[in-house]
Amino acid sequence: MIMEELQGSDTPRAGLEMSKRDILRHTKRAWAPLDGHLLPDSEEENPMVTMYVQENSKQESIQQWLDSGFFVSVNENFQQTINHTASLHEQGIIQMTVKDYMRSLHQFSETPTLSRGTSFNSCYSTTGVPQSIPEWLEFWEKDPVEILLDLGFGADEPDICTQIPARFLGYSSAARGINIHVFLEAQKQRMDFENPDLYGRFQQLEILDHVTNAFSSLLDGVKTQQNQHEEKAERQAMQNPSSSGAKEHKRKMSQLLKRASRQTSRMDGNPALSKSCKTEHEIPTLPTKPWDPRVELQVASISHDASQMLPLIECGSAQVHNDLSPCPPLCPPPHALLDKPWPCSCTLAKQSPHTCLSEGSVRRRNWKEKWNHMDRLKNLSHIVSKGPDSFEMEEVQSFEEDTGNPLILTSGIVGTRVDRTNSCQSDSSGFLEELPELQPLQVSSMTGSQSPTVCRGCKPRDQSHSPASQQDSLQESYGSKSKSMTSSSLLSQDWSTLEENASASVVEEELQLKAMEEPPEIVNPDMTLIKTIMVGEHPESVAGPVVTSTSTCNNTMGVLVTHVTEKEDRSVGHKGTRKMLIQRHHFESPRSFRIDQPSDNFYHVDSEITKTEDNCKVCPDTKQSSLVQERPAQHSHQHRGAMPYKGDLVQTSEKSIPHLDKPPGHVPTDSNAASSWSVTTQMSSNLVSAAQRVADLGTYNKGTAFECTPCDPLNTTDLKLQTETRQVKDVAVQTYAHECKLRPSHNDFIHGPRPLAKSISLDTGFPSISATGFCHTIPAHCCVCCHHCPNCQWRRQSPGPEPSICRHSLYSQAEDPKVQFMKTLKILQDTTVRDLCSCTVYEMETMKMVCQSFREHLEEIEQHFMGQQALYPRDMSEEEREEAEYLRTLREALRQQVAELAFQLGDRARQIKEGILLQLDLLCEELPEHCDNLPQCNWTEGKHGQRSCVQTHAVAPDPTLPASSGQWTPCSGMTQPVALSPSHLETRGGISLQSPARAESGPGPSLSHVGEKSLLDQSGFDDLCTKCNVQEQL
């Protein structure tokens, strides 16, 4: 049908032109609503225009879809396409089929992807119509710039604040703790801080690079500076050879004159010395640098110039022995040395045929020369072997120092120097090839008659240590500003003295042989040992001790060499110092020493005890340290740590506690053996348990016992104290870990039992509830054992399941606080019952009333606490709830113990009553004349009369009534049996005893039962009074 319509069109060309005009017209109308030119009023006035514009836009969109290539690919005839679209539009079929597409087109029109001037209108502004498919594709191609802009390319990324709606930024947040502005500022700072630049994150590499460069430049600068100084001196010598040569010649002549003058005077008095000194010229000394031009002169001087150097060497060796003698008149110097010109090193470099000597050849030559003259070194007992090699980067000494070895003249001191010949440096870089093994210096033994050594830069040593100081004065100083001198105290002595000390020479020869077996070293004949080291250098890399001379005046050196390893850790391991120490040990105290550090960097070691070590090493009084790590094995039962409190109460010594190591039972009871403790009775709650432990040490000491009664843990409402009691072993020093129990001392048994010292109160601690008969005195002492306790012995012999007062069982570490409270209150109960022996019936009645009132007060407190806890159950933390539970346990235990105490008071009153009645019955059965001696008592008088009667009969000694003896203490819940006949039991059947089990299980019934029974049955007393009156009438 479509094909027929296309074929039926007569005027194709006219239709094409009309279609083109319609497309342009429709395009203008389609862009009009998108640009917003049409107002709502115009749309309401012209509804037909609006409908027409919508239809045209639909048609235009369909036309674009058709022109995109779908229909053109089927039929390339443009006229057919136009006719086909016109027929479809006329039939009105498009409106129902492309509804969804139009909706998407409307959404597309809201986002202007195409501009009217560039994309859409420009397509229709062309003069001609595309005739091919590539032209159509180019004609309908969208602008790539527009597409990229729509996708987000090419535009600046919007700030994060633009993505937040303005209503959130304009008003503050209603939520608490949130501030939008602060949040945004923090985010901005975070973005600024987190710089993606990796260079900022790895600035440490740059710092390390700077540090490395600084060290490298420092090392290079030191080497370069030394080289520059040397080159400068050489240039000056070359430029002005006459002046420099004259100065050097003058200086050498002055030195040689001094040496020659001393040589003549000393060799005249000691001919053997000159013979021994003649062998020293054969020991050469080579510079450090083997390629130095002066090497050839040094090697050649061994064979050719030995005779010329002999006076100089002899003069240097003679200085060692007779440097303290007065200087004699000058003698003519040897002309061979004075007239001999000393060429410069630069001249030698030109004249020497062996300038380019290899390093290996020089070393082999040095070793060969040294091994050839080793036998001569054995005969020189005064030569000091070389110390540690120098680790600094220094050039070799000048020519005259290498050959002549000038002496460093100091009053009484001969300096020693070590040349760089045997240095372990292979080049001038300053780094070692291998670390040389350190060798102890050897010093010949001196006689005790010589004066003490005065070291350079050191104070004179004590006169008492002068013999040892002569050998130990050789010390090394590290870190000095200039070249540090290692001074030797080899004083002048005769050759005969050296021969007498043959044993010392043998030991030294052996040590020298051992030293020679190590890496070879060449020793200068003039014994000058100049030790150079950089300032601040810390020679920690040197293995072994530095120097240790352990010898006294009667022993040769090397005897105490074994102590070197014992002391090397102490000599080196001193914090805060960058220097190694040289120690001196003596036989009298090899473990105790003191180190003094004077300002001149020399370290003196004296055999005294330092303040920091005398407490942990040696105790002169007790011969035993008071610290834990120094105690013997028998103190292993003590605690590993001691935490002092209140003025170091637990830090004691063996002398202050004489019975510390004695077993329990052997502790002296003498009051003079009390320890010098300062006891304070007002202790905090966390120290009460610790005081109980410490009180074990003061057992049986009169007047020094702590007031640590078993009721002390109850002086606070904080029940965490009971958990601290289980940890008391870590805070107190004690002899045995027994729990602190209450028991009477010997004085208590002699003078009778004492009343209760303190009463218990939950809220006030220890209130002074003073009732009739109460006496606040010193409580019974705390004890560890009861070997001498007659009360405990009587208890162990008596039958019954009652618990003992003096217990030895240890509280378990995991013991429940409730059980611990029960045990403590049980001890309180036993103590109270024991102290009731001296109480009267009226006092016991008063105490019973106090117990009842206290029980009522405790119930009121409990109700108050429960009400407070019910009001704030949610606000309580876990710790507060736990504390409340502990308080409840405490109140329950107190209530139970108060009920038990009330029962015991009533029981004791009944016992007193039965005892009185028994005494009355026995007196009534005796003869009437005995009854006449009875005092006249009015039994119906009341309480005061009862009290006087009871007191009268309580003092009468009787074996059946041990309550008056003061030696018997009833057990908790234990009823004392009395001898009563069946008739008496029948007449007094109203009196019944209640067991403590019933009292503990039910405190309420026990109190009610006690309340029902009075302390003294008035009817029973009336019967007794009637009997007495009848007997008196008879």
From Swiss-Prot:
Coiled coil start-end: 843-902
Q: Where is the sequence biased in composition, kind Polar residues?
A: 443-453, 465-476, 669-678
Q: Extract one GO molecular function annotation from the record.
A: signaling receptor binding
Keywords carried by this UniProt record:
Coiled coil
Which residues form each disulfide bond in the chain? none
Q: What SMART domains does the record point to?
A: KRAP_IP3R_bind
Q: Which InterPro entries match?
A: ITPR-bd, SSFA2_C, TESPA1-like
Biased-composition ranges for Low complexity? 477-486
Q: What protein name does the entry list?
A: Protein ITPRID1
What segment(s) does the record annotate as region Disordered?
223-290, 442-486, 624-678
